[in-house]
């Protein structure tokens, strides 16, 4: 079962597949060395990066993420402020402290961190880490694939089914299965998801995780609207959320007469989160970093304009959104490198639309209709980040998709006819569309806006 613990993970920006996943892979590699009793013999580490990870890796801080993972840190607990100093020290000394200081090994950044233009065979995001002893003998080598949303899998386990899956009361593979459970038992999506979660862990742990997810999202918005400046990288993108926030605060009475001013607030919420992500801040995968602004922006819309935002509302929103996200993870992809941005922003839009419909009192059928509408109108969305960075068009795209999610929810709630397209069919279509998409438009920065906009 794919849990809300899988779909919503606290991490660091700017990318779940290119930053969070590689950091986890680096940490896993070190843990494996220790478990195999080879750690003490390591003298040098070497990293090879392939495919989309390589082509947009510098802009996504993939190399930095791998190093921090080898250093013994994970995305949810790494000290963000420590990273620049640590990386500079590695580059200057050509030494890398691994496993949180347990050992120092040789690491020449230019020679031991190699970005290749080629792809590995199993997935678009591949990386191989090699440990060598003092005589340059290979002690251990492992290839990892970062398959989207911060999920990683090593070569030996790629494509394999989950070992010893936990039996849940309401198993599902498709939206059709979920709707059947809801109809037969008189349950909402969020209730079905919660009862499945309780097969994995106690209720207190689930509630604590969901509370921490929303707390982190809120903190991200707060930091985003109060942090001025220019985002890292050659694009020199100026943060827009703070100025928009000031405008909305200063003109609240006048703007209240504008029926569209709600959109300005939704835009601001999304911009704040994604600007924090682009700056390498603390964010929550929802389901990815590149699309991390949509789920919090839509719940913030509810809090400001619908409310009140109780703990029960937060939980039901995230449970329903997470359940819809799991359908895409199981039956399609949430990796921009695999299916384009429809797998990131498209999925996040679908998740947020479903979550909002759930807490607005929609039926399970309406929740799935909202999710379907949101994805249907993101089909074919390309992933063409300018300069290989998660800034243009990514930041603004989250704002647009947040508004689209709200609209999808409203359309689903007010629909009086049966839909012609089901959620399962749109998920199937999204995956096929992504696989048919030219690799130029799947997070390689080789086509689209990425080759039309000049970094200066």
How does the language model describe each region?
Residues 2-5, 20-23, 27-28, 36-102, ...:
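Structured, active/binding-site neighborhoods that engage oxygen-rich ligands
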Residues 203-340, 448-456:
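Accessory "access/gating" subregions that flank catalytic or transport cores
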